[in-house]
From Swiss-Prot:
PROSITE patterns reported in the protein's UniProt record: COX1, COX1_CUB
Organism encoding this protein: Rhinoceros unicornis (Greater Indian rhinoceros)
Binding site for Mg(2+): 368-369
Gene this chain is encoded by: MT-CO1
Keyword NADP: no
Full protein name: Cytochrome c oxidase subunit 1
Mitochondrial intermembrane face of the membrane: 41-50, 118-140, 213-227, 287-298, 358-370, 434-446
Length: 514
């Protein structure tokens, strides 16, 4: 029965499918918001109205893309679908909690959309800094609704994290050690630990902001002995691990894709890859104040956060060079998924290099809150996380659906998207170096050229999004069945065929390990 299957589901494959569909839908909303931003900035002068409505759009774009697109697709979609199949578990450890994790997201999304519909909306930026987010600068219910939205999304992610940690540690075959699980499983495990440690701090921060706004507390108000800088520390102690939460599952997917299409039986440097992800996860928690170089910290504090941030480049470099070593000498198959993976490696590295530039506290004083920062994090998100999602989608689409995509169109889609995102975000480095500030709806006309090119690039990306919707429709309409998939020890998720039966591994699986 439809309701029993999709509303009260306890099946990891169905819940994974729900996450993928929800994430795709939210991605459309986030894309629409981003196109509003680029339409406003395509020429000098005003299009939408004042800076408040513009900043409401910017804030909603960030929240939708992070909490309702990337996280549901990577952790909820790919994580739910693949982790049990990869470790030979019959399902997740807590199947009903898994269902609740998903169904907390639509109400959360509804609250976020409601926040923009009441009063003037939450034009705070996704950081929601007081005093701008206080009840003076943002009177009315908008910011409160945003905070409640974040509470629900946060609970959803915490429950999901508990579920994945329990599943991965406890539901492997007895003979399988943690160091025999695939890298995607490792990446989800580390991501879940990060979520579990980071989200409660965000919850504390936004709850204090909620009481400051409504119950007259003064956690972040100097008039009552509070400090707005405390909020920034709490937010970024969550916010920096969050950006690693967004990219780590992508690392796992890229490892699988590169290994598979290089014709290798395993990735290069498995243990090094695991160590690198663990290091990134640990270091991600001790670099948060590099987002706050302009708030007047001591010089020795700034020196620490600069050097600690640069240390993260080492395990990241281990991963990049291990992917290249996996490619080396392989029988490379130029499939669409491989193109996404290669694009990921190149563009993620570019984004990482601009991150190293921003890690220098003295340089960051000049570049903070300019478009250079926007360019940096969109290279690692829009061309890191999203390229990993796209690569994972075209690679595992046959597993999820039983049908194959049209390879030619998938390659054309990659090409259009590649051109589009680079045309959108590469010029933003120049804008930032020229001093164009973030979060303003208008600019001096000296910045016109690069902004116009950037906005044209966003329209190219839009055509890519529309082409992908068509490709998925075409695949389901044509019904090309999957013929064969080459099995190695590194892609056991394909063991049961495409798509796999509703219940897999119902009996304990026999594992013969070397």
């Amino acid at each position: 029965m439809f309701i029993n299957r999709w509303l009260f589901s306890t099946n990891h494959k169905d819940i994974g499918t729900l996450y993928l569909l929800f994430g795709a839908w939210a991605g459309m909303v986030g894309t629409a918001l981003s196109l509003l931003i680029r339409a406003e900035l395509g020429q000098p002068g005003t299009l939408l109205g004042d800076d408040q409505i513009y900043n409401v759009v910017v804030t909603a774009h960030a929240f939708v893309m992070i909490f309702f697109m990337v996280m549901p697709i990577m952790i909820g979609g790919f994580g739910n679908w693949l982790v049990p199949l990869m470790i030979g578990a019959p399902d997740m450890a807590f199947p009903r909690m898994n269902n609740m994790s998903f169904w907390l997201l639509p109400p959360s999304f509804l609250l976020l959309l409601a926040s923009s519909m009441v009063e003037a909306g939450a034009g705070t930026g996704w950081t929601v800094y007081p005093p701008l987010a206080g009840n003076l600068a943002h009177a009315g219910a908008s910011v409160d609704l945003t905070i409640f939205s974040l509470h629900l999304a946060g609970i959803s992610s915490i429950l999901g994290a508990i579920n994945f940690i329990t599943t991965i540690i406890n539901m492997k075959p007895p003979a399988m050690s943690q160091y025999q699980t695939p890298l995607f499983v490792w990446s989800v495990l580390i991501t879940a630990v990060l979520l579990l440690l980071a989200l409660p701090v965000l919850a504390a921060g936004i709850t204090m902001l909620l009481t400051d706004r409504n119950l007259n507390t003064t956690f972040f108000d100097p008039a009552g002995g509070g400090d707005p800088i405390l909020y920034q520390h709490l937010f970024w102690f969550f916010g920096h691990p969050e950006v690693y939460i967004l990219i780590l599952p992508g690392f796992g997917m890229i490892s699988h894709i590169v290994t598979y299409y290089s014709g290798k039986k395993e990735p290069f440097g498995y243990m090094g890859m695991v160590w690198a992800m663990m290091s990134i996860g640990f270091l991600g928690f001790i670099v948060w104040a590099h987002h706050m170089f302009t708030v007047g910290m001591d010089v020795d504090t700034r020196a620490y956060f600069t050097s600690a941030t640069m240390i993260i480049a080492i395990p990241t470099g281990v991963k990049v060079f291990s992917w290249l070593a996996t490619l080396h000498g392989g029988n490379i198959k130029w499939s669409p998924a491989m193109l996404w993976a290669l694009g990921f490696i190149f563009l993620f590295t570019v984004g990482g290099l601009t991150g190293i530039v921003l890690a220098n506290s003295s340089l960051d004083i000049v570049l903070h809150d300019t478009y250079y920062v926007v360019a940096h994090f969109h290279y690692v998100l829009s061309m890191g996380a999203v390229f990993a999602i796209m690569g994972g989608f075209v690679h595992w689409f046959p597993l999820f659906s039983g049908y194959t995509l049209n390879q030619t169109w998938a390659k054309i889609h990659f090409t259009i998207m590649f051109v589009g995102v680079n045309m959108t975000f590469f010029p933003q480095h120049f804008l930032g170096l020229s001093g164009m500030p973030r979060r303003y709806s208008d600019y001096p006309d000296a910045y016109t050229t690069w902004n116009t090119i950037s906005s044209m690039g966003s329209l190219i990306s839009l055509t890519a999004v529309m082409l992908m919707v068509f490709m998925v429709w075409e695949a389901f309409a044509s019904k090309r069945e999957v013929s064969t998939v080459e099995l190695t020890s590194f892609n056991l998720e394909w063991l049961h065929g495409c798509p796999p039966p509703y219940h897999t591994f119902e009996e304990p699986v026999y594992v013969n390990l070397k």
